[in-house]
Amino acid sequence: MGTLNILLVDDDRNLVTTLSHGLLKAMGEATSVAVSFSGSEALSLLSTQVFDVVVSDFNMPGPSGLEFLNRIRQDHREIILVLITAYGTDALEEGVRQLGVGYITKPFEPAFLVQLIKDLIHDQDPVGRTDKVSRIVDKLGKSAGSSSSLRAGGQLLE
């Protein structure tokens, strides 16, 4: 089975450290986490590396938030996108819904992010999945449990 490649993008170095350790611990050895501290740095990484999941802060240097994720979506439809935000507005929810992006509002526990990523992997259209992501779906199995802080496409996951 291939490795699940995750890119974390946030200008808060402490949060990136906490989340990357949490993801590696929870998702297991078949996970690789790369980090970036700005939207422009992340776009550069995306031009040279392949990622299955991108988790991005809404408010950061360089292209930020929905603009950043929209640029990724234009070139990489297969990547699962997650937005981390402290701003849960109706306008943001509409933008997230249109892009098909999962999101979590701050503050949250790293376990919530892990669960959202698993849910988004399982919910991804099987036609659009790569063989590697399909194998990851089989390995992860559908986990139970969620939180009211978990959102996908602006909808609460239950």
Predicted regions and their residues:
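Two-component/phosphorelay signaling modules centered on CheY-like receiver
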Residues: 13-34
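Alpha4 helix (beta4-alpha4-beta5 surface) of REC/receiver domains from two-component response regulators
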Residues: 67, 88-104, 115
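CheY-like receiver
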Residues: 124-158
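Receiver (REC) domain active-site loop signature in two-component systems and cognate sites
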Residues: 60
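Conserved Asp/Asn-Gly motif in the active-site loop of CheY-like receiver
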Residues: 33-40, 110
